[in-house]
A protein has these predicted regions:
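Periplasmic-binding protein-like
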Residues: 59-66, 148-184
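Short, hydrophobic alpha-helical packing/hinge segments within bilobed ligand-binding/sensory domains
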Residues: 4-5, 26-29, 123-127, 133, ...
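Ligand-binding cleft/hinge of the Venus flytrap
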Residues: 5-14, 94-117, 148
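Acidic, polar ligand-binding/catalytic clefts
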Residues: 6, 10, 15-79
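A ligand-binding cleft/hinge motif common to bilobed small-molecule-binding domains
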Residues: 42-49, 97-104, 127-161
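Extended ligand-binding regions for polar small-molecule ligands
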Residues: 2-11, 70-72, 79-80, 84-85, ...
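Alpha-to-beta junction loops
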Residues: 13-15, 31-40, 84-85, 129-138, ...
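Short helix-initiation/N-cap motifs at beta->coil->alpha
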Residues: 17-28, 73, 112-126, 163
Length: 192
C-alpha cells in the first residue's frame, strides 16, 4: 500500500506524508479528518460504502494458511473450521465470513471456530508456529508470500468471495474522483 500511495502522490503532484496506523484506527482517522486517504488493504463493502468513498486498485482474494506441518490439508467450507482456532482481524471481511460460517456450523450441530483476534502479523506467525492457533485467515497475497519466503506455512484454501481493495476517503469530499483518475492513469501507463 505505501507503493500505491507513492504512485498516487506522484501522479497527482502532491507531497506524500505516510502515517503508520493500526487497522482499527483507519475509520476514525478518515472520518475525523486526521487522514485524507487510507490505504491499509481496505476492502469495499456495502456497510463501508455508507460512510466512505472508494477508488479501487486491485481484486482481493482471501486464503487460509496453516503451519507447514499441520494435519489440516484443506479448508473449503465451514465444516473444515469447526472447533479450530482461527486468526482473523477485527472488523475485516475475514471476520464477517468466519462468523457466518460459525452460524452455519452451529445450525448443523458442529462446534464453531474460535476467532483469535490479533493486531500484528508477528503475533500471528508466533501463534501459528506455537500451536496457539490452527489457521490464519487473511489476504491471499500475504499468505502465499509468507509460505514461499519461509516455508513454515502453507496455503490450504481460498476464501469464498473476492472483494475490491480501494483507497478510502471521507464520504462526499470529492477526492475519490482524482484518486480513481490517477489509478486509471497508472494502469494505462503500466506503473501499477
Amino acid at each position: 500500500d505505501p507503493d500505491i500511495a507513492r504512485l498516487l502522490a506522484g501522479s497527482l503532484g502532491l507531497k506524500l506524508k505516510l502515517v503508520p496506523t493500526a487497522w482499527e484506527d483507519w475509520p476514525l482517522g478518515i472520518t475525523s479528518g486526521r487522514y485524507d486517504v487510507a490505504l491499509v488493504n481496505i476492502a469495499v463493502t456495502e456497510q463501508r460504502k455508507a460512510k466512505f468513498d472508494f477508488a479501487t486498485y486491485r481484486v482481493d482474494s482471501l486464503a487460509f494458511s496453516v503451519k507447514s506441518t499441520s494435519d489440516i490439508a484443506s479448508v473449503s467450507g465451514p465444516a473444515d473450521l469447526a472447533g479450530k482456532k482461527v486468526i482473523v482481524g477485527s472488523g475485516t471481511n475475514q471476520e464477517r465470513i468466519l462468523l457466518g460460517w460459525n452460524a452455519e456450523n452451529e445450525a448443523a450441530g458442529r462446534q464453531p471456530a474460535l476467532p483469535v483476534y490479533l493486531t500484528d502479523d508477528a503475533s500471528g506467525n508466533l501463534y501459528i508456529q506455537s500451536g496457539r492457533a490452527d489457521v490464519f485467515f487473511g489476504p491471499q497475497s500475504v499468505a502465499a508470500y509468507k509460505a514461499a519466503l519461509s516455508g513454515k506455512t502453507k496455503v490450504v484454501g481460498l476464501g469464498p468471495k473476492k472483494a475490491y481493495v480501494a483507497t478510502t476517503t471521507r464520504k462526499g469530499n470529492g477526492l475519490v474522483y482524482a484518486l480513481q483518475a490517477a489509478l486509471d492513469g497508472l494502469d494505462l501507463d503500466g506503473s501499477h
